[in-house]
């Protein structure tokens, strides 16, 4: 079927665009010899893992469930980092992960020997205290007082011999100039530890918008080579968004039109339920064939069927009047959508579909009342 024939609401993964992103990432790997992992926190649609696995080295996880998903569905390198690990989970994690990164030396001291006995490569996350985030403090791991990563003041030289690698993750949707700035801070504060003979790898985390049209890939590759050559380490990069950037849609139908001073489209999709970053970040998601408010002839506010007054996606304009029953297509909806959605107000989760490289769509998963009630008791 075609995309306009899909049931709504429905997420759609565009496999042609997904492959294009993967080809860009693989070229970085081929040019530099670095390793690239899928950060599953952004995109976990495992039916695409066979495709992703053709290009990338494996997966990285934020806890046990993601680690199990990567292990079972991709079966390549499997890394995990979490702010803390439960004692009840560490055994299973060491059975399925090759790399385990700790957030503190107290956790490393507790578990490192056990991990080593299981043949797991052990790392520590550092905080270079170099903030490059700008306006989005909620996504800044280097914000004052951040719980994420060990600062230089708290770095324990007495435990450094237990380490195999060092990890940092400070970026969010950023270009490689910010990585270059961050690396200078990492080298200044932690360079002497990177030079130790037991340190075999450096993981530069995610937030690298490598597949964005204006991303400076040449600078990224220079950064990677510099760290490889200076410290004789394997460099890992673990993008999430860059893997599936602009490779998905959320198809929604106009259910009603309300005008209480602002012409408002009531959609069967919701910002609060189906694209929570719209309210959390906040941001205005791209919408196919639309413009900014008042840019085109007909302007509408887009909202949803929930009772939340602030469940507003944004104001958009169109060349033609919108009618009840029309379908709209939000773009760049593969990332941080399905992994974060919810059933507030009893809203149904959108179906999930894939679009093959010829443009044909097939529904992979549908949801109903059963999924809603199963989570609640």
Predicted feature residues:
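N-terminal capping/small domains of soluble enzymes
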Residues: 1-75, 81-85, 270, 318-331, ...
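A short small-residue
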Residues: 2-6, 164-170, 205
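Active-site-proximal beta-alpha core segment in soluble small-molecule metabolic enzymes
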Residues: 34-201, 215, 223
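Glycine/Thr-rich phosphate-binding loops of Rossmann-like dinucleotide-binding domains
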Residues: 110, 132, 176, 212, ...
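Glycine-rich beta-alpha junction loops
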Residues: 126-130, 170-174, 208, 241-243, ...
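Acidic, glycine-rich loop-and-beta core segments that form the ion-binding/anion-interacting portion
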Residues: 186-242
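Charged (often Lys/Glu-rich) extended helix/loop segments that serve as interaction or gating elements
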Residues: 223, 237-377
């Amino acid at each position: 079927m075609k995309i306009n024939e899909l049931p709504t609401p429905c997420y759609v993964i565009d496999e042609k665009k997904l492959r294009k992103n993967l080809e860009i990432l693989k070229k970085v790997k081929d040019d530099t010899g670095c390793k690239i992992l899928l950060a599953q926190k952004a995109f976990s649609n495992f039916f695409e893992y066979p495709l992703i696995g053709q290009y990338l080295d494996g997966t990285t996880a934020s806890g046990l469930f993601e680690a199990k998903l990567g292990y079972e569905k991709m079966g390549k390198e499997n890394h995990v980092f979490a702010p803390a690990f439960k004692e009840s989970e560490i055994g299973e994690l060491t059975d399925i992960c090759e790399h385990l990164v700790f957030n503190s030396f107290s956790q490393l001291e507790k578990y490192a020997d056990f991990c080593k006995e299981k043949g797991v490569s052990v790392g520590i996350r550092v905080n270079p205290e170099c903030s490059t985030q700008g306006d989005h403090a909620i996504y800044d791991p280097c914000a004052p007082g951040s719980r994420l990563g060990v600062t230089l003041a708290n770095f324990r030289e007495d435990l450094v011999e237990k380490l195999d690698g060092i990890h940092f993750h400070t970026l969010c949707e950023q270009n490689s100039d910010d990585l270059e700035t961050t690396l200078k801070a990492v080298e200044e504060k932690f360079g002497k530890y990177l030079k130790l003979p037991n340190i075999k790898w450096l993981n530069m985390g995610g937030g690298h918008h490598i597949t964005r049209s204006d991303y400076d890939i040449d600078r990224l590759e220079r950064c990677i080579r510099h760290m490889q050559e200076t410290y004789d380490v394997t460099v890992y990069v673990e993008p999430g968004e860059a893997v599936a950037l602009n490779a998905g849609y959320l198809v929604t139908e106009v259910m009603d039109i309300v005008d209480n001073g602002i012409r408002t489209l009531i959609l069967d999709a919701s910002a609060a339920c189906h694209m929570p970053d719209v309210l959390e970040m906040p941001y205005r998601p791209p919408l196919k064939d639309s413009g900014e408010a008042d840019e085109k002839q007909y302007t509408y506010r887009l909202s949803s069927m929930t009772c939340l007054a602030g469940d507003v996606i944004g104001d958009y304009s169109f060349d033609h009047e919108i009618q009840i029953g029309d379908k709209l297509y939000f773009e760049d909806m593969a990332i941080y959508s399905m992994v974060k959605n919810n059933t507030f107000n009893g809203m149904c989760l959108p179906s999930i579909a894939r679009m093959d490289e010829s443009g044909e769509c097939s529904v992979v998963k549908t949801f109903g009342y059963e999924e809603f009630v199963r989570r609640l008791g």
